[in-house]
């Protein structure tokens, strides 16, 4: 997907998102020479936008880094990654899929009433193992500006403390650095980018999707935005 093959609108969107991403990376020194960075691809708009932004940035960024994409397949039926594989080929990014039986364990064997916590723990375990095998030293998560605000609200409402994501976090156990390059981009801008670039988004097949504390925080913030815009 070379820029000269895109429409003027698409080029503008690429340059804008790349600019925001680079500003975050430079502000918090997220990337060093020789890094091997993985992007965790869920199939959602956020992770695909991050993949695109980093793939574009890699072309001219002064610090040279390798980039791969990786998806943890939880074992849902009809989870088709064909279009994501094609996007990765177009962006010259190696793509890896980690097949698991997490869905079966969480929903059928354990029958978890609150499945998100166990699922996240198992998913991260499978992801970190693969990253270790591939000798990646950094993982880029697609948390955007709205995610940071929602996490702050969730910690306040449900934990009684003030907390949100850090721009980068070192994980001692897995010897990995987590970076969050989309922190300056809001969700509306990501939606526009996804639509303009026709990114191959996969709808989440998870039966618990839409019933999380994060979704509650998202809706609460949307109501606040209606009442007091800006």
Which role fits each region the language model picked out?
Residues 117-188:
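Active-site adenylate/phosphate-handling loop in enzymes that bind or generate adenylated species
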Residues 1-15:
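Single conserved hydrophobic/aromatic residue that forms the stacking wall/gate
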